[in-house]
């Protein structure tokens, strides 16, 4: 098959992005929504192809959970049965580690349930027929207007029509914008972006609608428009008033799994540094037993963590520091007071911090990541510095996607 033709091919594997991969004489091509062993007709465009017809289906194929699957670009793998899907997702972590020469124990994938994603970032646009609200088509800016989503919590999906009403008031003409909805203990927290400058009339109308529909808050580009209720989320026993758009783990159940792994490894550590701590997802749980130094570059997240600490008694001391750990990692000397370090960086990982940590005498480390490639790089640095990787646990926090969370626990100086 040439680089811009239609033809028949056989899918050999699933790539790291969740697409089927076929090996052709002139290279690999990637075909979304296919499975290993399937024979398909495709329309090829260079190294990508569109599925035109399924000629021979895999016995591992199943009916997708959502009517929007293959139109909506939010999910890649609803059509794959659970067992092979989970083995493949675990292998993303195993393969990344082996690519760095790291052969360690990788636990079975921890499964997560459907209907548990507590934040949805919707693409939206106002049309003559109303507001489109949903997710972009696969590799496109076209918005697929949704009526269901088996990934997201029902409390958000039940409010789609109400969200469209809010979107109608926010819309910047006919241009696209984003509207995120986060489930908190106080109700739905709405955060809009890309709506341009809101005028006074819009603000008054939005305020009235948010109150009428019993949303907890509406913000735009980080500015709070109206906040009838403080959006709260508990981390351990500490209720934290989360700032607009702050980072949260995608599902509460995955967060609990990660926290349990962190706490089990830290054990009786007296002083812990929690790096890239966010709003205190792990720091506030750790503080129930250990003194914690929480480091984060997001001032609003740190302020929220601090407010949470001030309203709860019985915690060990919690100190906070605003710091860009990419530019200014904690140096080896600064790590001397700590028995343990936890770090949960963005997808780029924590290479500079890992280089300093590798030279330290910190006894226990927990590395958390949503990117197996950068996690493997950082773990290889720590391993070279004398750390022993005890175990890596992959967690399917991003159901039916090509993304996977992982928690690695490491020790130094103890056999």
UniProtKB/Swiss-Prot annotation:
EC number of this enzyme: 2.1.1.-
Binding site for [4Fe-4S] cluster: 66, 72, 75, 149
PANTHER family tied to this protein: 23S RRNA (URACIL(1939)-C(5))-METHYLTRANSFERASE RLMD, RNA M5U METHYLTRANSFERASE
Species of origin: Brucella melitensis biotype 1 (strain ATCC 23456 / CCUG 17765 / NCTC 10094 / 16M)
Binding positions for S-adenosyl-L-methionine per the UniProt entry: 249, 276, 296, 344
Keywords attached to this entry: 4Fe-4S, Iron, Iron-sulfur, Metal-binding, Methyltransferase, S-adenosyl-L-methionine, Transferase
Name assigned to this protein: Uncharacterized RNA methyltransferase BMEI1496
GO biological process: rRNA base methylation
Gene3D superfamilies: 2.40.50.1070, Nucleic acid-binding proteins, Vaccinia Virus protein VP39
Domain of life: Bacteria
């Amino acid at each position: 098959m040439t680089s811009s033709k239609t033809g028949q091919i056989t899918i050999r594997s699933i790539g790291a992005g969740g697409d089927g991969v076929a090996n052709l004489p002139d290279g690999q091509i990637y075909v979304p929504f296919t499975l290993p062993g399937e024979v398909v007709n495709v329309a090829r465009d260079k190294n990508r192809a569109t599925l035109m017809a399924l000629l021979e289906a895999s016995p591992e194929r199943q009916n997708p959970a959502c009517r929007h699957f293959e139109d909506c670009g939010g999910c890649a793998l609803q059509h794959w049965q659970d067992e092979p899907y989970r083995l493949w997702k675990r292998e993303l972590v195993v393969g990344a580690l082996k690519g760095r020469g790291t052969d360690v124990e990788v636990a079975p994938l921890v499964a997560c349930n459907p209907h548990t994603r507590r934040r949805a970032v919707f693409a939206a646009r106002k049309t003559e027929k109303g507001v489109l609200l949903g997710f972009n088509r696969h590799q496109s800016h076209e918005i697929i207007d949704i009526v269901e989503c088996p990934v997201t919590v029902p409390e958000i999906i039940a409010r789609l029509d109400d969200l469209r009403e809010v979107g109608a008031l926010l819309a910047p003409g006919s241009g696209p914008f984003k509207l995120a909805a986060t489930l908190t203990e106080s109700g739905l927290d709405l955060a809009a972006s890309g709506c341009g400058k809101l005028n006074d009339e819009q603000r008054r109308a939005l305020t009235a609608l948010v109150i009428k529909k019993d949303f907890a808050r509406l913000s735009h580009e980080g500015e709070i428009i109206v906040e009838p209720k403080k959006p709260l989320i508990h981390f351990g026993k500490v209720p934290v008033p989360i700032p607009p758009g702050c980072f949260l783990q995608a599902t509460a159940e995955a967060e609990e799994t990660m926290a349990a792994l962190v706490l089990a490894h830290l054990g009786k550590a007296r002083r812990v540094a929690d790096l890239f701590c966010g709003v205190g997802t792990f720091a506030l749980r750790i503080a129930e037993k250990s003194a914690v130094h929480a480091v984060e570059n997001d001032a609003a997240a740190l302020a929220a963590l601090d407010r949470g600490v001030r309203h709860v008694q019985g915690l060990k001391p919690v100190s906070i520091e605003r710091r860009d750990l990419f530019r200014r990692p904690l140096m080896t000397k600064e790590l001397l007071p700590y028995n343990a370090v936890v770090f949960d960086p963005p997808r780029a990982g924590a290479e500079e911090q890992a280089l300093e940590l590798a030279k330290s005498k910190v006894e226990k480390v927990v590395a958390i990541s949503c990117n197996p490639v950068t996690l493997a790089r950082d773990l290889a640095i720590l391993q070279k510095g004398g750390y022993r990787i005890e175990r890596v646990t992959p967690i399917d926090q991003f159901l039916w996607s090509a993304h996977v969370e992982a928690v690695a626990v490491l020790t130094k100086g103890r056999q």
